[in-house]
Amino acid sequence: MRKVAIYGKGGIGKSTTTQNTVAGLAEMGMKVMVVGCDPKADSTRLLLGGLQQKTVLDTLREEGEEVELEDIIKEGYRQTRCTESGGPEPGVGCAGRGIITSVNLLEQLGAYDKEWGLDYVFYDVLGDVVCGGFAMPIRDGKAEEIYIVCSGEMMAMYAANNICKGILKYADAGGVRLGGLICNSRKVDNEQAMIEELARKIGTQMIHFVPRDNFVQRAEINRKTVIDYDPTHGQADEYRALARKIHENKMFVIPKPLEIEELESLLIDFGIAN
C-alpha cells in the first residue's frame, strides 16, 4: 500500500486535485482510501456525489467511544473509501490535534488492514506545514510520499518551499520523501517553466502541469469529479495523466528548500517580481 499526502497552500486546489487524481487511479482499477485532514471536511465530497459526510471528530463527540468503522468511512466513486477527520468547534481546541486523534482511531478500527486490499491511501492535508498536527502524516510515517500542489503565484511557491522544510525536518526519522510538485495552473506568465525550475532547484520534478479549465468548477457544481461528470472531456485526460504519473513515479527525494533570497531571485528571473 502506497501512503501519499497532498500538501499545498490553502485555496490552491488540493482537495479538487486529490479527488480528481483519485478518480483517475480508481478508474485504473486501484483501491484507494482518502483521508481528509482539513477541518472544512471537503476532501471527499466529489467522490461521494456531494455528500458532506459526518467527520470522525463529530462522530466521536456524538457517539463517544462506541464508534464503528462503518460510522466514519463511506464508499464513493468506484469503491473509493472516504473519511474526514474534521476539526474542533470553531474557536476551541486545535485542528492539528484532531488529525492525530482521527488517524489513530482509523488505525485502531482496522481501516488500513489487509482485508480492504488498499493500493493507496491519500491524505489531503490543510495548507502549510505550520503546526505539528498538520505535519503528523509526515512526522509519524503515516505518509511516505508527498506531492505539493502549487502554482506560479508567489505565495503558493513560498508555501511549497516551506512544506519542503517540513519534509526535510522529518525525512530521516519518518522516511518520508517528496514525489514532486503538481502545478495547478493559475495562468501566471511563464508558469510552467517557472515551476519546472523551482522543482529543479529543490531537487525534485514537476510531475504534472494541470491547465486551468472552468470545466473543473462545472463538475464541482454538479458534485462530481471531472472523470465522473464527463469522462470524454480533455480535462479528464489531464487528471488521468497525473494519476498515471503518480502511479509510475520512481523519483522520491529529500528536498533542498531554497533560501528566501533564492526564491525571490527565481521570481525576478521569470518576471513575476521586480
Curated annotation (Swiss-Prot):
Entry-linked Pfam families: Fer4_NifH
Keywords from the named record? 4Fe-4S, ADP-ribosylation, ATP-binding, Iron, Iron-sulfur, Metal-binding, Nitrogen fixation, Nucleotide-binding, Oxidoreductase
Question: What's the name of the protein?
Answer: Nitrogenase iron protein
Query: Which Gene Ontology MF annotations are present?
Result: 4 iron, 4 sulfur cluster binding; ATP binding; metal ion binding; nitrogenase activity
* GO terms for biological process, alphabetical: nitrogen fixation
Q: Does the keyword Nucleotidyltransferase apply?
A: no
Listed binding positions for [4Fe-4S] cluster are 94, 131
E.C. number, please? 1.18.6.1
Question: How does the annotation summarize its subunit structure?
Answer: Homodimer.
Gene encoding this chain?
Answer: nifH
Recorded catalytic activity of this chain's protein: N2 + 8 reduced [2Fe-2S]-[ferredoxin] + 16 ATP + 16 H2O = H2 + 8 oxidized [2Fe-2S]-[ferredoxin] + 2 NH4(+) + 16 ADP + 16 phosphate + 6 H(+)
Q: Which family does it belong to?
A: Belongs to the NifH/BchL/ChlL family.
Residue(s) carrying ADP-ribosylarginine: 97
Q: Which organism is it from?
A: Chlorobium phaeobacteroides (strain DSM 266 / SMG 266 / 2430)
